[in-house]
Amino acid sequence: LHHQIIPVLSQQQTPTHALQPHHHIPVMAAQQPMQPQQPMMPMPGQPSVTPTQHHQSNLPQPAQQPFQPQVPQQPPHQPIQPQAPAHPMPPMPQPPLPPMFPMQPLPPLLPDLPLEQWPAT
């Protein structure tokens, strides 16, 4: 009975698992672009401001230019670093979690039924 039930469930899970990995792949891809986007957001602002300031005045503003980018860069970099490891970590536990959830209840349920019947009888 156990062998028969396990294969059936595994077959049903096979398509589900196949779908889950596919979903995880796009999710990870979406997260990866998001990470670069965060650093890129300040970057586009810096280049756009850099040419404008350079055009306006190279000598007086160079001192302010490095200060302005450094101040915004440091705070974003700190949150980005913790977020970068945090993003990859959730997706990795997710794939094992879905298979474990369905598998854990199945084995306990099967033994529970016979265990209850044994004492009952």
UniProtKB/Swiss-Prot annotation:
Q: What does this protein do?
A: Plays a role in the biomineralization of teeth. Seems to regulate the formation of crystallites during the secretory stage of tooth enamel development. Thought to play a major role in the structural organization and mineralization of developing enamel.
Region listing for Disordered, in residue ranges: 1-20, 32-121
* Name recorded for this polypeptide: Amelogenin
Q: Which PANTHER family would you find in this protein's record?
A: AMELOGENIN, X ISOFORM, AMELOGENIN, Y ISOFORM
Gene that this sequence comes from: AMEL
Where is there biased composition of kind Pro residues? 85-111
- An example of a Gene Ontology BP annotation on this entry? enamel mineralization
Compositional bias annotation for Polar residues: 48-58
